[in-house]
C-alpha cells in the first residue's frame, strides 16, 4: 500500500472511505422482498423501512462528492485534481435531473415509502408495464374498461424512466459519461495516486452505487420483488 510522499496524508487516507460509505448506506433502504416469518414474528426484508426512501438516497449519495473532492485535491497531482473537478461537476449537475425525474413517479403513488410503492405495483401493475390492475389482467375484459388512465400515465413515466436511467449512468461514471476517469486524457482520474485497498474502496463504492441505482430503478418502475403472477 504505497502512499506518495507529496500527498496531503489525512485527506488522502479519508477520501476512499468518504466515497464508499454513502453508497453502502443507501443499500439500507432498498426493500429486497416482502415480510418473512421468523419465530412467529414478521420480519421485513429491508434494513431501514423509512417513509422518505428516495430523499434519503439523494441526501446520502450526494455526500460522496466530498470524498472525490478530497481525493483529487489531496493527491497533489494535476491529473487527479482535474479528474476530481470533472467528477464533482458531473455528479452535482446530474443530481438535479435525477431528483426531478422522480417527481411524476412519486406523484402517481402519493408516497415515498419504497415498500409501499412495491405493494401498490403488485396490486395495480408495474409503473411502466401495467399489465394488470384490481380488475384483472390484460386477458380480462374488465381490465380494458378500467385501464385508460394507467396507459396514459405511461407517457410522462416513460420520460421519467429514461431521464432517471441516463442520470444514474452519469452519476456512476459509466460509458459514455466516463469523463472523470478517461485514461486517454487523465491517466486514471482522481484515483491515479491510489493503490491497494484504498484504490479498491473507490471501485467498491462505485459498483455499490451502481447496484443501488439499479435497485431503485427496479423498485420504482418494474415492481420490485413482485411479479404479478
Model-identified regions with their sequence ranges:
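Selective transmembrane helix interface/packing segments
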Residues: 1-229
Amino acid at each position: 500500500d504505497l502512499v506518495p510522499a507529496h500527498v496531503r496524508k489525512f485527506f488522502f487516507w479519508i477520501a476512499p472511505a468518504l466515497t464508499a460509505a454513502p453508497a453502502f448506506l443507501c443499500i439500507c433502504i432498498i426493500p429486497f422482498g416482502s415480510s418473512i416469518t421468523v419465530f412467529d414474528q414478521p420480519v421485513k426484508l429491508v434494513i431501514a423501512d423509512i417513509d422518505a426512501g428516495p430523499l434519503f438516497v439523494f441526501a446520502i449519495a450526494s455526500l460522496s462528492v466530498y470524498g472525490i473532492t478530497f481525493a483529487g485535491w489531496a493527491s497533489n497531482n494535476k491529473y487527479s485534481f482535474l479528474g476530481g473537478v470533472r467528477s464533482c461537476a458531473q455528479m452535482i449537475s446530474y443530481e438535479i435531473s435525477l431528483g426531478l425525474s422522480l417527481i411524476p413517479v412519486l406523484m402517481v403513488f402519493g408516497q415515498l415509502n419504497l415498500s409501499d410503492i412495491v405493494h401498490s405495483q403488485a396490486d395495480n401493475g408495474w409503473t411502466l408495464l401495467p399489465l394488470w390492475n384490481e380488475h384483472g389482467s390484460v386477458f380480462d375484459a374488465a381490465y380494458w374498461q378500467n385501464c385508460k388512465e394507467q396507459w396514459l400515465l405511461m407517457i410522462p413515466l416513460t420520460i421519467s424512466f429514461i431521464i432517471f436511467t441516463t442520470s444514474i449512468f452519469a452519476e456512476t461514471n459509466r460509458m459514455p459519461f466516463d469523463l472523470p476517469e478517461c485514461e486517454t486524457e487523465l491517466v486514471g482520474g482522481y484515483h491515479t495516486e491510489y493503490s491497494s485497498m484504498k484504490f479498491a474502496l473507490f471501485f467498491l463504492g462505485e459498483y455499490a452505487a451502481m447496484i443501488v441505482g439499479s435497485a431503485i430503478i427496479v423498485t420504482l418502475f418494474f415492481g420490485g420483488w413482485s411479479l404479478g403472477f
